[in-house]
Amino acid sequence: ISEIVIENKNYRNDRINYLISKFELDNLKNIKAKFLSGGQKKKLVIALSLLSEPKVLLLDECFAALDVLTIKMLQEIIVNLQNENKITICICDHQARDLLACVDIAMILSNGNIIAEDTPSNLVKDINAKNAYFGDNFKFN
């Protein structure tokens, strides 16, 4: 896949090594993907999606089935990608607390309609978001 995405072999190898390091996969680079844990596979898939340096990245349920340390690492990577690489990242996830910790703007969908859209700190106060998703006892930060 990498040969199709990046023709220049030196640049391709540099990019692969950078992503392996960024996602802390150094000790796994000689292991076949089928032997990786779920969290390791998820990190690998996201790293592969960044190989071509996209301007927009779509992540679906990226926090699902991950341990707390991997979630924290992924949140930091998402924030860094947004800030350093100026990449737009759209995330769809049911783990609101994990999602809100690393985004600038969030939306709540209900029955296919956007019912609330705001910064995370404002969104958790929104009455529509509370009624449809958060409830009264949700605490953020």
Which ranges hold each PLM region?
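Conserved ABC ATPase signature
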Residues: 32-36
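Walker B catalytic motif
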Residues: 61-62
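Helical segment within the ABC ATPase nucleotide-binding domain
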Residues: 72-84
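Conserved catalytic motifs of ABC-family nucleotide-binding domains
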Residues: 53
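Conserved ABC ATPase "signature" region
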Residues: 10-28
